[in-house]
Design a protein with these regions (language model features):
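Charged, low-complexity intrinsically disordered segments
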Residues: 2-169
C-alpha cells in the first residue's frame, strides 16, 4: 500500500496572487468569486452544520468563532452566519448586551472547528484530501488592490491534512 501524499504546494507567493489562476496554482476561499467548489465550501460563512465535542453544534465556522469570542455565549449565534450574524452581534454589542471576551481564537481551537466542519461533509473531506494547491482567502478593495483575509484560517488549512488523517484512522 502506498503512503498517502498529504503535501500542499507551498511555493506560491502569497503577496502576488493572480486571480485568473484560481484553481490552477491556488484555491481561492471565497463565497462568490471563486473558480472552485472547494474554495466556496471552505469559506468561513459557508453553511455546513458541524458538531464540536466540547462546544456543541454550529451552522458555520464564523458562527463557532464568533460564539467563542463573545463573553455571553448566546445560543442564537450557533445558527447564524454571514450578514445576519454580523448584524445580530453588532446590535448586541451596541446595546451592551454582550461584548467580546477575546479578540482572537487560538490556532488549536480554530483547527478543531475546521477539522470537525470538514469531517461533517464526506464530499468536502474528499476534496480537501485530494487538493494539492495552496488555499488563499482574498478580495480586492475599492481601489482594486489585493487584500488577504482570514489569514489564520488560510494558514491552518494549508497544514490540516495530517490532522484529518489522524482523526479518520
Amino acid at each position: 500500500m502506498s503512503e498517502l501524499d498529504l503535501s500542499v504546494d507551498q511555493t506560491l507567493d502569497m503577496t502576488n496572487i493572480d486571480p485568473s489562476k484560481d484553481g490552477i496554482d491556488h484555491i481561492r476561499i471565497n463565497l462568490n468569486d471563486t473558480a472552485t467548489l472547494l474554495g466556496e465550501r471552505l469559506f468561513i460563512d459557508h453553511i455546513r452544520v458541524f458538531y464540536h465535542p466540547r462546544y456543541g453544534s454550529f451552522i458555520s465556522i464564523s458562527a463557532a468563532v464568533t460564539w467563542y469570542k463573545l463573553k455571553n455565549k448566546d445560543e442564537n449565534i450557533r445558527s447564524l452566519c454571514g450578514a445576519r450574524l454580523r448584524e445580530y452581534v453588532d446590535k448586541q454589542i451596541k446595546s451592551g448586551e454582550n461584548e467580546y471576551e477575546v479578540k482572537f481564537i487560538p490556532d488549536n481551537l480554530l483547527e478543531e472547528f475546521l477539522v470537525y466542519s470538514i469531517m461533517s461533509k464526506p464530499d468536502l473531506l474528499e476534496m480537501v484530501m485530494s487538493n494539492k494547491l495552496p488555499y488563499v482567502a482574498y478580495y480586492f478593495d475599492s481601489d482594486n488592490k489585493f487584500k488577504m483575509r482570514d489569514k489564520q484560517m488560510t494558514r491552518i488549512l494549508n497544514n490540516i491534512k495530517p490532522k484529518l488523517v489522524d482523526l479518520n484512522n
